[in-house]
């Protein structure tokens, strides 16, 4: 059951652009030189979040596996699944010109039965260039079983570029930096 939840979360993340669809699933196997050429270029001025050493591993009973190209980032109090290259690419653009991203957050002890709309607050600031702050929607709890609930939150970014995103829930705060590109 734990694997089922992990798979569903990953499929949802892929559908919203949080995680890349593996190149081998798109068009056969890709050689390493071709893969390097396809990797997005992040400007040195954007300090994207890199995989930590040692890697963060979610506490049991939460899933600890990821797909290639992704990593768990955070602490037992609040964590998220990010891309290892620090980018969000190909986000849908809404009629108002903003770029939509759906985020999935985990908090040890979060109980969906007690809080359907958890008070997760997500803020964001563009680094290096002025832009209005991101818009954050209402957070929702979600799960496919009683042991692994997580929190979803949709954000709208008013511009492409380098963004510092911060989530706050209960007594936890987690920030990361991403390069948002077309």
Residues covered by each model-derived region:
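Positively charged n-region of N-terminal signal peptides that target proteins for export
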Residues: 1-4
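Bacterial N-terminal signal peptides
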Residues: 7-18
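Signal peptide processing junction and immediate N-terminal pro/mature segment
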Residues: 18-27
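Contiguous segments within soluble domain cores/interaction surfaces
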Residues: 28-158, 162-182
């Amino acid at each position: 059951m734990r694997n089922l939840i992990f798979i569903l979360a990953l499929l949802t993340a892929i559908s919203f652009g949080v995680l890349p669809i593996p190149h081998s699933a798109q068009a056969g196997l890709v050689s390493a030189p071709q893969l390097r050429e396809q990797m997005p270029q992040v400007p040195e001025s954007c300090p994207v979040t890199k995989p930590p050493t040692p890697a963060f591993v979610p506490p049991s009973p939460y899933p600890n596996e990821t797909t290639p190209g992704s990593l768990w980032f955070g602490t037992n109090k609040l964590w998220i699944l990010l891309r290892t290259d620090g980018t969000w690419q190909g986000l849908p653009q809404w009629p108002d010109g903003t770029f939509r991203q759906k985020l999935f957050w985990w908090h040890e002890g979060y109980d969906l039965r007690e809080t359907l709309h958890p008070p997760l607050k997500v803020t964001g600031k563009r680094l290096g260039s002025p832009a209005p702050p991101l818009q954050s929607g209402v957070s929702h709890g979600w799960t496919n079983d009683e042991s692994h609930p997580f929190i979803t939150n949709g954000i709208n970014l008013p511009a492409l570029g380098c963004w510092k995103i911060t989530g706050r829930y209960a007594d936890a705060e987690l920030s990361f930096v991403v390069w948002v590109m077309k």
